[in-house]
Amino acid sequence: MKTFVAKPETVKREWYVVDAADKTLGRLATEIASRLRGKHKPEYTPHVDTGDYIVVINAEKVVVTGNKAKGKMYYSHTGYPGGLKETNFEKLQAFKPEMIIEKAVKGMLPKGPLGRDMFRKMKVFAGPEHKHAAQQPQVLDI
């Protein structure tokens, strides 16, 4: 019996919607990253994007444990000398809650072109409404 290798043109992708309300950030991000990679499928192949599409709603209601709301820092750089900017979880959640989940999941995906393709299949929305109803996503309980 030969080893099965998935081919990009034969991969069947599903759409799922995940409600992030009152979910722990890390536990949510690991499950999303695993689904984006396709590791839950029997035809998973490391060098082929076999993952599904994930729509995350209620990103503004995701939680972290302990004192991380004030202590967890996010850094960005403008590209200019002295341009290191930092903000904590609380401020970023108030300003741009989608970025929290995006940054957590992106760090768990492979680096390079394949990882970028996987990351593009995730759509994050701050509130309960999303614009992908036409794809008829199934509810994924995490």
Swiss-Prot record:
PROSITE patterns: RIBOSOMAL_L13. InterPro entries: Ribosomal_uL13 (IPR005822), Ribosomal_uL13_bac-type (IPR005823), Ribosomal_uL13_CS (IPR023563), Ribosomal_uL13_sf (IPR036899). It holds the Pfam family Ribosomal_L13. Transmembrane segments: none annotated. Part of the 50S ribosomal subunit. This protein is one of the early assembly proteins of the 50S ribosomal subunit, although it is not seen to bind rRNA by itself. It is important during the early stages of 50S assembly. GO terms for molecular function: mRNA binding; structural constituent of ribosome. One of its GO terms (cellular component) is cytosolic large ribosomal subunit. Keywords: Ribonucleoprotein, Ribosomal protein. Belongs to the universal ribosomal protein uL13 family. GO terms for biological process: negative regulation of translation; translation. SUPFAM superfamilies: Ribosomal protein L13 (SSF52161). It comes from the Bacteria. This is Large ribosomal subunit protein uL13.
